[in-house]
A protein has these predicted regions:
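N-terminal secretory signal peptides that target proteins for export/translocation
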Residues: 1-7
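Mature catalytic domains of secreted/periplasmic carbohydrate-active enzymes
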Residues: 28-445
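Bacterial N-terminal signal peptides
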Residues: 11-23
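Eukaryotic non-globular interaction segments with acidic/serine-rich, low-complexity composition
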Residues: 2, 20, 415-416
Length: 445
């Protein structure tokens, strides 16, 4: 018992947590079927109703101002890269201010990179000294954000990297070949490390609404299929917090144990980024599309190619029309400030959502091929919302299937529009879209 107590104290885990880490051996003996709990099913519905979240890629890589992959793309030596942690002191970071900014923008949740591929942990982890507490800052970033989210009623999601470019026990995949680490691949020890960290995140930071995994694709070119044992990990998460949703950015069809289907830089079904392939779109799971506000995920000082507010608002509408949430990314600066242009875009999105939010939040997607790329639709029960995304539209020739079309009004003004019925089909006429309008919404009852 003394040895067990010592190990538990050394790792910072409770006895219950330690037993949970031993659960994979039992999980392998269970069937692959996954039956989500009642809490989980409710959480899925709540998540789908939120429709808009903020992705935050922030770590010591922000000091290089070259994006979150700089350890890989810059072919840096890992030991030299790690020294930058000694300079990480985000003196302007204010979690409450961040969350207020996101809330004012109309976002309902955040997803924060607790540990990216460079292995640096942004919380007070006991599993590695390579963390925020061993920088000059010495404050738990994850705790600050978690507390701010809980105080403001903002959903809290944690990004967690499956792959690691620093640890010697991580089995080398198709990335991370240039860091100079000593390779001693042992997936069992690495798997235990990840599970111990996940246990910390799910026991020390209050309610966590989702875990967002990334990096599974690092072994997609192995000659022998790599067994990540993700189902065991998913089961661990669901035991620790049954309502916590699991998503994995693996670019594959959903797997047993997952609660969200994720799409990277891709509105579901469009495969514009080439990551979705033949994965299809789940008809049972909530969906989420993540996209950058400029070009990079992490802060890159030279990347000032921000999408316009019009583009972002239209992306939000298109995503909602597919029945999906939009997770919009921001790469905070190393000093703890949010980039000025990003804040400006958030303000513009928030202004639009204050006036048009009922056409986004709590809605379902609508199949409406007739609209092409000019008009998309969402619905809430028998109320349909026609999102006009091009300024030259003057009429809607055909309403979506199931739309009775008894009354049509401009959502923001209440102005009534004429509904015309010809040969059994209803159309809306007399539409005048303001020149600078990103998304002109017509509410049809």
């Amino acid at each position: 018992m003394r040895k067990i107590s010592y190990l538990l104290k050394r790792t910072g885990l409770t006895l219950v947590s330690a037993l949970l880490l031993a659960a994979p051996a039992m999980a392998q003996q269970t069937s692959a079927a996954y039956t989500p709990s009642a809490e989980n099913l409710k959480a899925r519905k709540d998540f789908a109703n939120k429709r808009f979240g903020i992705f935050l890629h922030w770590g010591i890589y922000s000091l290089f101002a070259q994006g979150e992959w700089y350890l890989e793309t810059g072919k840096l030596n890992g030991q030299e890269y790690e020294k930058v942690a000694n300079a990480f002191y985000p003196h302007d970071f204010d979690a409450d201010s961040w969350i207020k900014t996101f809330k004012d923008a109309g976002a309902k949740y955040i997803c924060f990179t607790t540990r990216h591929h460079d292995s640096f942990s942004m919380w007070d982890t006991k599993q590695s000294d390579y963390n925020i507490m061993h920088t000059p800052y010495k404050k738990d970033i994850v705790k600050a954000l978690a507390d701010a989210c809980h105080k403001e009623g903002m959903g809290l999601h944690f990004y967690y990297s499956h792959l690691d470019w620093r640890r010697p026990d991580y089995p080398l995949g198709r990335t991370g070949h240039h860091t100079g680490r000593e390779l001693k691949p042992n997936y069992q020890t690495y798997f235990n490390f990840m599970n111990a960290q996940l246990t910390e995140l799910l026991t020390n930071y209050g309610k966590v609404d989702a875990i967002w995994f990334d990096g599974y694709w690092d072994h997609d070119q192995d000659s022998v299929p790599f067994d990540w044992r993700v189902r065991e990990q998913y089961d661990l998460i669901h035991r620790l917090q049954p309502a916590c949703l699991v998503g994995n950015n693996h670019h594959l069809p959903p797997m047993a144990g997952e609660d969200i289907q994720l799409f990277e830089r891709d509105v579901p079904g469009e495969n514009e980024a080439g990551y979705s392939g033949e994965n299809g779109v789940s008809e049972t799971l909530p969906l989420e599309t993540c996209q950058t506000m400029n070009g990079m995920w992490g802060y890159k000082v030279a990347d000032q190619h921000y999408k316009s507010a019009t583009t972002l608002i239209r992306l939000l509408a298109r995503t909602a029309s597919k029945g999906a949430n939009l997770l919009m990314n921001i790469g905070p600066q190393p000093d703890g400030n949010l980039p000025k242009t990003a804040v400006e875009r958030l303000h513009e999105m928030g202004t639009w959502l204050k006036a048009n939010g009922e056409a986004i939040y709590g809605t379902d997607g609508v199949t409406y091929p007739q609209g092409g790329d000019s008009i998309v639709s969402t619905r809430n029960g028998q109320t349909f919302y026609m999102h006009i995304l091009k300024n030259d539209v003057t009429r809607i020739d055909e309403l979506p299937a199931g739309c009775k079309g008894k009354e049509a009004v401009v959502l923001t003004t209440g102005e009534k529009l004429r509904i015309k019925k010809v040969k059994g089909k209803k159309s809306i006429e007399g539409i005048s879209v303001p020149k600078e309008c990103a998304d002109f919404v017509i509410k049809v009852n």
